């Protein structure tokens, strides 16, 4: 007999990957794949037996086979609330002495949820968010308030809309973004459920720092963002059409076409020299078309309402992309090419902890103005987060060929785990090392005709890489990490930050 079907989360109606499906008291069975599907054959003599479906964090399900054989099974797994009930019981015992901790925990959970249903949670068609980006603060905008809304599958299982509007009380400017998405597969709640197969139209007008953001990264930075971008950032508006597809085998690709306009912020200027005369551009307009290929073996997610959390973090992830673009200057169009290769891997070190490693190579093959060059913090953010350079200024190191390496160690059963209160709060050790090195080819050296003058704070790399390291602890209150960051090289640069305490959010 053929036994096949799907396993879904009963609360979110999302696939449950890597669940054990087997016939009771026999070794016959399989594990669901990364989209919750299973299929296996069993002897006809077992058709009256019981099918068992089990997975961590879910209650075990028992189904009579003879009631399921004539159709494809859909197994709904109820989340196992034992841990939640145990925590509530413990909180009730400690209510008199632990009210503050309980309140902090509830606030942290509220922030992590990130979205609020507009209306009845069982029937609402729109959600408000993101909580994590309202409000934020940065030196350019000062206090920034942002509010957004996104549709879900109750409005349409194929069409999705999302948008936000933000206002900076320091720069007194409105920012906004709108996105219309068509998913070629019907989705249970949001358009990003694995595997994606969607076409999107995007328009955005917001702050953009070339030295702190990858050109294709969403503007979702938290808390004290653009920390060293004052007078080194731009305002950017762009329109884009992109198509993204993910496959069950871990392969994914994105194609995009975009037209952007960059306007310098603060004292940043787009000045250049031509025939011994000085000129200034008020804006830089460019168009791009590109492709990104990603591969992650065994890619699978725990898919919740509006989030998807990767299950397998130890498989390496590879990125390869190429962009063809053109920028306009003196009413002439100049073509450029940009290539990127990135790899990231998590290593488990037994009870000691884990080590996250990320390596990147970027190359601009053509003559381009400095906003289109590469910088240390331009990176693909996937499973491994919170590894950004911290002490360098946004545009401090300019290059058209760049290599970066980032290593982060987080302890498990080390010193802090031996201290009862630290272990109870799950606070763990954190050590990291980051290095960046690059070169600037002759065609992009300062002083070349029709290239913008570099900002005064921009430098080429010398014979050594830029290196910084950190030591601290993470998982404070379940979402904060605190560390001391130290700068090892290029300490002679003007206004260089040599060391600083950093507080960051891990969500």
Which role does the model predict for each range below?
Residues 27-37:
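Short, acidic Ser/Thr/Gly-rich low-complexity loop/linker segments typical of extracellular
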Residues 23-25, 47-64, 68-69, 79-82:
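A short, solvent-exposed loop/turn motif at the edges and junctions
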């Amino acid at each position: 007999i053929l036994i096949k079907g799907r396993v879904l989360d009963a609360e979110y109606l999302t696939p449950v990957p890597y669940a054990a499906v087997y016939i009771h008291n026999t070794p016959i069975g399989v594990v669901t794949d990364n989209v919750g599907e299973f299929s296996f054959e069993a002897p006809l003599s077992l058709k009256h037996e019981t099918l068992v479906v089990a997975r961590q964090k879910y209650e075990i399900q028992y189904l009579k086979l003879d009631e399921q054989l004539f159709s494809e099974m859909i197994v709904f797994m109820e989340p196992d609330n034992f841990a939640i009930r145990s925590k509530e019981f413990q909180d009730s015992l400690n209510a008199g002495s632990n009210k503050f901790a309980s309140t902090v925990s509830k606030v942290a959970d509220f922030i992590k949820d990130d979205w609020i249903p507009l209306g009845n949670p069982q029937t609402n068609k729109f959600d408000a968010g993101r909580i994590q980006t309202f409000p934020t603060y940065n030196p350019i905008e000062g206090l920034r308030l942002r509010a957004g809304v996104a549709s879900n599958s109750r409005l349409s299982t194929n069409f999705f809309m999302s948008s936000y509007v933000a206002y900076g009380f320091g720069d007194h400017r409105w920012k906004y973004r709108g996105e219309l998405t068509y998913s070629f597969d019907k989705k249970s709640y949001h358009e990003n459920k694995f595997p994606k197969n969607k076409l999107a139209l995007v328009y955005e007008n917001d702050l953009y720092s070339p030295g702190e953001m990858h050109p294709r990264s969403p503007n979702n930075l938290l808390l004290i963002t653009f920390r060293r971008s004052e007078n080194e950032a731009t305002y950017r508006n762009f329109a884009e059409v992109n198509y993204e597809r993910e496959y069950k085998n871990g392969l994914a690709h994105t194609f995009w076409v975009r037209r952007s306009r960059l306007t310098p912020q603060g004292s940043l200027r787009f000045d250049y020299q031509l025939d011994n005369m000085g000129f200034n551009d008020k804006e830089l307009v460019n168009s791009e078309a590109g492709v990104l290929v990603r591969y992650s073996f065994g890619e699978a997610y725990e898919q919740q309402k509006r989030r998807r959390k990767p299950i397998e973090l130890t498989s390496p992830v590879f990125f390869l992309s190429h962009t063809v673009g053109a920028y306009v200057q003196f009413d002439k169009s100049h073509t450029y090419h940009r290539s990127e290769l990135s790899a990231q891997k998590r290593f488990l070190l037994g009870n000691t902890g884990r080590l996250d490693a990320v390596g990147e190579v970027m190359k601009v093959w053509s003559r381009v103005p400095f906003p289109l060059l590469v910088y240390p913090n331009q990176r693909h953010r996937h499973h491994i987060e919170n590894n950004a350079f911290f002490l360098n200024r946004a545009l401090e190191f300019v290059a058209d060929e760049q290599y970066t390496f980032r290593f982060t160690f987080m302890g498990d059963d080390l010193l802090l785990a031996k201290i009862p209160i630290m272990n109870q709060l799950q606070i763990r050790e954190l050590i990291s090392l980051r290095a960046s090195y690059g070169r600037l080819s002759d065609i992009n050296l300062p002083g070349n005709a029709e290239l913008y003058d570099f900002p005064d704070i921009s430098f080429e790399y010398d014979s050594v890489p830029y290196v910084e390291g950190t030591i601290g602890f993470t998982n404070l209150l379940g979402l904060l990490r605190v560390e001391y960051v130290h700068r090892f090289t290029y300490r002679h640069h003007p206004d260089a930050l040599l060391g600083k305490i950093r507080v960051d959010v891990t969500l």
